[in-house]
Amino acid sequence: MTETLVTARAGATRWTCPFCLLLCDTSTVQVDASGALTLSGTGCACASRALARFSARPTTASPQVDGQVCTLDQAVAAAAKLLAASRQPLFGGLGTDVSGARALYRLACKTGAISDAAEGAALMTTLRATQDRGSFFTTLAEVRTRADLIVCVGGTPVEQAPGFFERCGVGEELVAKRHVVVIGGSGVDDAVLAALRTRPGVTVESIPLQGDLFTTVATLSALVAGRAVREAPTALKSLVTRLQQARYAVFVGETRKLPAQGALIVEGINRTVGTLNQTTRAAAMWLGGGNGAGTVSQVFTWLSGLPLRSRAGPLGLEHEPLCFDAQRLLAEGAIDSLLWVSGFDPDVAPPATVLPTIVLGHPDLASARASVFIPVSTPGIGSPGHLFRADGSVMLPLFAVYEDTLPMLSSVLDRILESTP
């Protein structure tokens, strides 16, 4: 028989890229005769790399139990049996969309599972700061139309959001003059600033750390508040003047780049923003929660009132931002089974463990040697879906590039739920 492509929807004018925090919708995807997916429109290396991991040809990946190919029914039954025998499951990875997150929450409630994302520590950084002191947020639209001063904390945010400055209109006529500052940048950031400098109306500046990032942020906060600082660096004094004179200043950072106890840095920036808002306008945007983790946290919050690192246990709903850290639970032997979800990026694989493990995700994760493996469709590639954007204020629809032969995660999880006693 001649192998045929699954029904392709390439060339549609609407395609939302699910592979970074910005959820850009300015490109389309083309499917060639070999089934390869290529990006057309706005170029993005991140999206192109991700698309190379997919094909419009029917996948050969099959469910597995203990490394042996089986039917979906058999894999679902094995997963349900494993979870039923577990006294404390951990749901990790959490690379999925809204419908997958809703199904995960239902299964977590039934099994008493603790849920934490693959980069849970980075996700908790801003959450803990908000829980302790409150936060100031903004949106990409606000930054695009109003911000005349953008301060990047700990480097530019191009690792997780490659097109950040383009999405924010830096160099466009919406804001005639913008100044971009990087505090504690690297050589990569110098290259980004050099490129920004060539855009109309854009000036740039790089400020080295004064000791470490904690000290630098604390010094900046004190200067903005008008407190005396002995031997304050000239560069920070100049930045304070710019902040006070700006029409709308925005601090931007990637939480995964922050050191341990990074919530203190976020609190310091929030304190600075609060002081500035007494006389002008300022806000902060912390980028994190990629691969669907931010979306899952949003969904868990609206369903239960609690974010990730929570569980529905014998004492009711419990939230422990420190004790329910997945890495800590694994290291201390506090859980006895692992369900790992990674539908967007096969490189986000489950940690090495001797625990019974269920893996639901990209077909390439078949090599993870899980007790149970079920390949599922990726939202925005083989199936539709929804994700929250980086700023957390907008949920965007994802459109399928082709009709997948793999099941959606939500349907697999619902079948496991029905089969779990």
What are these regions (language model features)?
Residues 1-221, 255, 418-421:
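N-terminal export/assembly segments and adjacent metallocofactor-ligating motifs
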Residues 296-314:
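Active-site loop ensemble at the mouth of alpha/beta enzyme cores that anchors a bound cofactor
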Residues 42-43, 287-289:
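Short, solvent-exposed aromatic-acidic interface loops
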Residues 279-287:
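Flexible, glycine/charged-enriched surface loops at secondary-structure junctions
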Residues 127-280, 313-421:
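Non-catalytic alpha/beta scaffold blocks inside enzyme catalytic domains
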